[in-house]
Amino acid sequence: MPSPISRTFAALLLAASPLALSACSESNAQESDRFAEVEIRAEPLADGVAVLFGAGGNIGLSYGPDGTVLIDDQFAPLTDKIQGAVKDLGAEPVKYLINTHWHGDHTGGNENLGQTGVLIMAQDHVRDRLIKGNDSTPPAPPAALPVVTYHDGIKLHLNGDEIRVQHMKHAHTDGDSIVFWQKANVVHMGDLFFNKVTLPFIDLSSGGNARGMLAAADKVLAMVDDDTRIIPGHGPMANKADLIAYRDMLKSVIGAVEKAQGEGKSLAQIQAMKPAAQWDVNPDAFIKGDAFVEAVYKSLQKPDHAEDHAH
């Protein structure tokens, strides 16, 4: 059964999703009105690589002579605005789409893009979860489903770069991928990295685990250098120093919770210790300290996927 945290997160996502709005019998006009004021802002990062900010997860973009690749697609009512931002960069319409994971603020535009012939790619579990849905998320329509899936990863040789897509197991969910432009030295981390806007959300009901979040941060840190541009799932652009600080936060909170669990302390007692207090500084954050500590606590009660994380 989904945890209260995951249900809350899903409810917030669905509050803005077209599927939920349809389920509530709201009109298409009302759906669009929710996003009428959203602007898609593009920031070039390297030759043929950009990030798009709007509502929902940050979007990565590769464009050039071999076609346009979108990394995540936010919400369905924003598809035309996203395509407009792509056009304004001088790029062709989207040809390929990679989903970093299955959540609706990263896959909400899948159906629109799929219906235009865009080739959708994602990790195996993303397709599985989109097909099944859950208590808060209806099953996705066929056009929204990835048609190319992978277990460990895939490489795209496009637009003068090698784009390496790698699965990070049991982290934010069980289907997270990072996308690394080798030549451009840009990496999109999806929701493996929330940069300065909230404490991390770990979707336990979708196979996520705090240990995997830490392992993913360590893996990416081993790949990057001081010049790497890092696209987080949410928040502003980041660099290696930002990711180090994020990794250290994860390590500190996980370590404190694990130590307290070993001493027999309950969840409430550990929350009262406020092990995430120094990072719980945004009053508007989606995930606050107690919710994050709860997710870490429950993660540590689950089997350790250390061997998976090492691969």
Residue ranges, per PLM feature:
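Divalent metal-coordination and catalytic microenvironments
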Residues: 48, 62, 72, 86, ...
